[in-house]
Amino acid sequence: MTDFGGEDLFGRGDYSFWSRLFRPASESLVEAAAISVGARVLDVAAGDGNTAIAAANVGANVTAVDPSPAQIERGRHRSEGSPVRWVLALGERLPFADGSFDHALDTFGDNLDEPTARPALEEMARVVRRGGVIGFTRWTREGFNRDWAELEERFLTGGSEGSSSPLLGTEPTVTAAVAPFSTDVEIIRQTLSIAWSSADSFTDALIAQDPYLHDLHRQLPPTRWGAFTDELRGLVHKWNSHATGGLRLEFPYLRVVVKTLPDGHGGGR
């Protein structure tokens, strides 16, 4: 992600590769958060608009924020004709008053990774009215998710294994993180299933289009990059559950819906 002074990560690659695949998770989160006509909804780390558009489609008044100018541009184009307002902002420094929204959502946003997870979550709680709803999705460290994360960490750190779990990647850590502003938390384990024509064609598309891999490619010398892509291809084959030559990959994640305390964190109307 950009820091408003550096290069925009999402100006490289093609994030729509993932956006198309993640759309069911956005629709599931909007439904679980019980968003209705006229609700004031904030989509944090909105990317190119999956969750914002899903909320607008049920009649909500949506504000979408993202720190990437490229994503903002894509999102505005995708949501043209929908009641979505786009704002360039960091998820951990939201430019809104306390209690400005009924719902704040975040679908796989980088802002809920370390080191910004806690301040980003606190900001979502701050801008939601008392008794409002926070909803987010987070990957778990299981299966292909775990192996891919550890592969990237190993190559970025020069050989040491990465084994730590993300702050919001398990039910206990999520419950602890939201405890300051809620005791009403629903955590549901879900799985995104991705289908493709073959494991190799998926890996080729992933390498060619994923913005994070574009960034990793720039950081690694050619021999290390070649070794990384070979191992990544092996992981895709390892976790492919399709039996007849196609690809089926499963990405487990947590869908979290939090109802904030009536007298808790944040402002009010």
Please state what every model-predicted region is.
Residues 118, 125, 129-198:
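Conserved catalytic/acceptor-binding region of the Class I
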Residues 40-44, 48-94, 119:
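Class I SAM-dependent methyltransferase SAM/SAH-binding core
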Residues 4, 22, 48, 168, ...:
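Conserved Class I S-adenosyl-L-methionine
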Residues 34-36, 57, 80, 129, ...:
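Short conserved AdoMet
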Residues 1-39, 50-54, 71-74, 78, ...:
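Conserved class I S-adenosyl-L-methionine
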Residues 92-104:
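A short acidic, Gly/Pro-enriched loop at the edge of an enzyme's catalytic core
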Residues 102-117:
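A short SAM/SAH-binding and catalytic strip from SAM-dependent methyltransferases
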